[in-house]
Design a protein with these regions (language model features):
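Individual alpha-helical transmembrane segments in multi-pass integral membrane proteins
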Residues: 1-13, 27-114, 138-141
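C-terminal ends of transmembrane helices
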Residues: 17-26
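Juxtamembrane/interfacial segments flanking transmembrane helices
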Residues: 115-121
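Juxtamembrane membrane-water interface segments that cap and precede transmembrane helices
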Residues: 122-136
Length: 147
């Protein structure tokens, strides 16, 4: 079952990459924003594949952190796409800047977590599941970042 799941994730990544290449050929802002979103989604699928299938505690913690960070960046890319699609790009410059600053800080903290384990840790890696445990001390982080 794990192999079928892995093949499904890789197939999804290949299809997303194909869509990203197609949207890159569009030479307008909307096409570029779709390309960026799909490229981030492709990267997230690959990192999630690494999280699921590559053994090793440090690699698994790093991949989980990168997956969470890529979710932030995918949401920002979706925000930019929506703003380009609706024509409201200039209306939300402050929101764009705040979101980017937030994502940079969150990405730093999630990558740093690989060595500090202040946010979460991997309790066990088994064939059937990977148990991620969030630290009670990181509740301030979780309430601030992921509400």
């Amino acid at each position: 079952m794990r192999i079928v799941y892995g093949l499904g994730v890789l197939l999804e990544a290949i299809l997303i990459a194909h869509c990203a290449i197609g949207s890159f050929k569009k030479h307008d802002r909307l096409g570029k924003s779709v390309c960026i979103y799909e490229t981030l989604t492709f990267a997230c699928a690959i990192v999630f594949f690494v999280f699921t299938f590559v053994p090793g505690h440090t690699v698994t913690v790093l991949a989980k952190g990168l997956t969470m960070a890529l979710f932030d960046w995918m949401l920002i890319a979706l925000m930019f796409y929506t703003q380009y699609y609706t024509g409201a790009v200039k209306t939300f410059k402050g929101v764009q800047a705040a979101s980017m600053i937030f994502a940079v800080l969150d990405t730093y903290m999630l990558i740093e977590n690989t060595w500090t384990n202040k946010i979460f840790d991997i309790e066990s890696i088994k064939a059937e599941n990977i148990k991620v445990v969030f630290n009670n001390d990181s509740l301030w982080y979780l309430s601030l970042i992921h509400i």
